[in-house]
């Protein structure tokens, strides 16, 4: 069984508090008839601060999709290489040991993929398998983990590097006055992670026992982008807030098949921080004590929703807290489709 090793996390230089974001929106849209409601909803997100790749005042002057794409590629190349090198070191491997590189990102576009840059910059083998994942949004991190697990199961030498990169601030549309645009502008943050999945049993971490996927039919409208001249415009249907009740039975089934116990009996959880409501629904539907998702809530509070990077941030927090050897756990994320990706396993100390 393959093992997820300790991730490397990087955050951009600029930081914004939620109060600063509220002040910014009030100044930009001082005559908006629903600003008071937007303010209350933003305060209810449980996000305290986020990191941005550019200062908010610079982002508020939309300089065009071309300029934002240049910033995206520049920072993607720079930050991904730093994170990747640290992750490979964390795993006790060298660049020559990597057989696959997966990259997840839904907040910008590059061709060739960032996987090509990483192969060149890190000096990976020319036979390295590439897996760029661009359209799974927040669930992409967990999807990459599950696909890397599939690859690692083929050979004990099939170590995989997973890089997740999200610059959601580059999708900020300052002139979009819809209520959900205000909320998303105050919810999503920027971050980069890298993590190695070792295909052998020679490292501590989250050893995956079984994975699962679930697609909710007729839910494409829940989470989507409208692609316009100004870039990506994020839209969110309120129905997504009630989606966990449909996914929870599949999570319970996967857990019971693997451990012969309910999710609530697990020792730890690595959950995507879709927002306060999603975490509340996970607690409710899986019959968990609220404190069981504290690390996901901490991630949301300290960095916002960092999309496909979230599961790696929460995984790193697990490493920092040090679960006992043999502790059982579940990793799960949710995103467009509506799609869920899950993995269950045990902690190797």
From Swiss-Prot:
GO terms for biological process: antibiotic biosynthetic process; polyketide biosynthetic process. One of its GO terms (molecular function) is acyltransferase activity, transferring groups other than amino-acyl groups. It catalyses: 3 malonyl-CoA + 3 H(+) = 1,3,5-trihydroxybenzene + 3 CO2 + 3 CoA. The active site is at residue 138. Pathway: Antibiotic biosynthesis. Disruption phenotype: Mutant cannot produce monoacetylphloroglucinol (MAPG) or 2,4-DAPG. The keyword Zinc does not apply. Belongs to the thiolase-like superfamily. Chalcone/stilbene synthases family. Type III polyketide synthase that catalyzes the synthesis of phloroglucinol from three molecules of malonyl-CoA. Required for the synthesis of the polyketide antibiotic 2,4-diacetylphloroglucinol (2,4-DAPG). This is Phloroglucinol synthase.
């Amino acid at each position: 069984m393959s093992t997820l090793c300790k991730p490397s996390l990087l955050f951009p230089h600029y930081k914004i508090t939620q109060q600063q974001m509220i002040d910014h929106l009030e100044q930009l849209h001082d005559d908006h008839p629903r600003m008071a409601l937007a303010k209350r909803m933003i305060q209810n997100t449980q996000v305290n601060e986020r990191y941005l790749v550019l200062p908010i005042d610079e982002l508020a002057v939309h300089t065009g999709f071309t300029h934002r794409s240049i910033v995206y590629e520049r920072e993607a190349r720079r930050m991904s290489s730093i994170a990747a090198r640290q992750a490979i070191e964390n795993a006790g491997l060298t660049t020559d040991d990597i057989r696959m590189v997966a990259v997840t990102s839904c907040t910008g576009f590059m061709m060739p993929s960032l996987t090509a840059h990483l192969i060149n910059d890190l000096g990976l083998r020319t036979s390295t398998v590439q897996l760029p994942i661009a359209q799974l949004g927040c669930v992409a991190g967990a999807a990459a983990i599950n696909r890397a697990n599939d690859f690692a199961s083929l050979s004990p030498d099939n170590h995989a590097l997973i890089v997740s990169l999200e610059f959601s601030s580059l999708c900020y549309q300052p002139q979009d006055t819809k209520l959900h645009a205000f909320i998303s502008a105050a919810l999503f943050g920027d971050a980069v992670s890298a993590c190695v999945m070792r295909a052998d049993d020679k490292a501590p971490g989250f050893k995956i026992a079984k994975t699962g996927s679930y697609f909710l039919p007729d839910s494409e409208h829940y989470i989507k982008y409208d692609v316009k001249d100004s870039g990506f415009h994020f839209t969110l249907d309120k129905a997504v807030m009630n989606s966990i009740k449909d996914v929870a039975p599949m999570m319970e089934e996967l857990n019971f098949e693997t451990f012969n116990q309910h999710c609530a009996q697990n020792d730890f959880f690595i959950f995507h921080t879709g927002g306060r409501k999603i975490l509340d629904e996970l607690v409710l539907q899986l019959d968990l004590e609220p404190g069981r998702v504290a690390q996901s809530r901490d991630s949301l509070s300290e960095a916002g929703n960092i999309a496909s990077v979230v599961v790696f941030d929460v995984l790193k927090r697990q490493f920092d807290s040090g679960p006992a050897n043999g502790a059982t756990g579940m990793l799960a994320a949710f995103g467009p489709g509506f799609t869920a990706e899950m993995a269950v396993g045990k902690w190797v100390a």
